[in-house]
Design a protein with these regions (language model features):
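Hydrophobic beta-strand anchors of alpha/beta hydrolase catalytic cores
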Residues: 70-71, 103, 165
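N-terminal "domain-start" segment that seeds a small globular fold
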Residues: 29-62, 87
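Bacterial N-terminal signal peptides that target proteins for export
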Residues: 2-10
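Thiol-/selenol-based redox modules, centered on thioredoxin-like
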Residues: 157-197
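Bacterial signal peptide processing site
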Residues: 24-26
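Short active-site neighborhood of thiol/selenol oxidoreductases, capturing the structured segment around
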Residues: 61-89
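Structural microenvironment flanking redox-active thiols in thiol-disulfide oxidoreductases
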Residues: 86-146
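C-terminal motif of bacterial Sec signal peptides marking the signal peptidase cleavage site
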Residues: 19-22
C-alpha cells in the first residue's frame, strides 16, 4: 500500500514540476515576444474589414486577433511585381513553420479576382500552405478604406499597388512595413519573425 502511495505521489510531483516548467517557459516566451515588439514602432491599428477568402469563407478584422499576420496586396493576373512578392512570401512561409503566423494576400482587382479565381490561382501557383489566405474585399469601398487605414494608399488602378509586406501583431497593431523587393527589408523581416517564434 505504501509503495502505491509513493508511486502516486511521485507521479503527482512529476506532473506539478512539468506544469510549473511549462508555465515558466510560456511566461518567458511571452516576455521575449513583448521585448521584440517593444522595439517596433506602432503605426496604427488594423482597420475593420470584411472579405471572402479563396476557400469561400468570410474573414474579418476580428479574425486577425491572436496571431501575427503578414499582409500584402496583389492581383492574380499581375505579371510584374506580384510573382516576385509571392516568391518572397513563399520563402518566408518555408522558413517559418509557426502556427501563430498567418499570411494574407489581398487582391486589388476584386472585379476580376473572384474567390473562385483566387482558388484557381492558388492551385496553379502551388501555394498549398493553409496559413496563407487569399482575400477579396466585399467591395472597392472596403478595399479603399482598408488600404488607406494601413497607410499604403489606394489608387484605384491595380497596377499601382504597394510592394510592401505589412507586419500586424496579435493585437492587430501595425508593426512594420517591409519592401518585398528589397533584400535588406526581407532579411530584417525574417530576423524579426525568428525572434517572435
Amino acid at each position: 500500500m505504501l509503495k502505491n502511495y509513493s508511486k502516486l505521489l511521485l507521479v503527482a510531483l512529476m506532473f506539478v514540476t512539468f506544469f510549473f516548467n511549462a508555465c515558466v517557459d510560456s511566461q518567458e516566451k511571452s516576455k521575449d515576444i513583448q521585448s521584440v515588439l517593444s522595439e517596433l514602432r506602432v503605426y496604427g491599428t488594423t482597420p475593420d474589414f470584411l472579405g471572402i477568402t479563396d476557400s469561400q469563407t468570410e474573414l474579418t478584422s476580428k479574425d486577425l486577433h491572436g496571431k501575427l499576420w503578414l499582409i500584402s496586396f496583389f492581383f492574380a493576373s499581375c505579371g510584374d511585381i506580384c510573382p516576385k512578392m509571392n516568391a518572397v512570401k513563399s520563402k518566408i512561409i518555408a522558413n517559418n513553420k509557426s502556427d501563430s503566423l498567418r499570411f494574407l494576400s489581398i487582391t486589388v482587382d476584386p472585379e476580376t479576382d473572384t474567390p473562385e479565381f483566387l482558388s484557381k490561382h492558388r492551385r496553379e501557383m502551388k501555394y498549398s500552405d493553409n496559413r496563407w489566405l487569399f482575400l477579396r474585399m466585399k467591395n472597392d469601398t472596403i478595399l479603399q478604406q482598408f488600404m488607406n487605414g494601413l497607410l499604403v494608399g489606394y489608387s484605384g488602378n491595380p497596377e499601382n499597388h504597394s510592394a510592401r509586406i505589412i507586419l500586424i501583431d496579435s493585437k492587430s497593431k501595425i508593426r512594420g512595413y517591409f519592401d518585398a523587393l528589397d533584400t535588406k527589408h526581407v532579411d530584417s523581416l525574417e530576423s524579426i519573425l525568428r525572434k517572435l517564434q
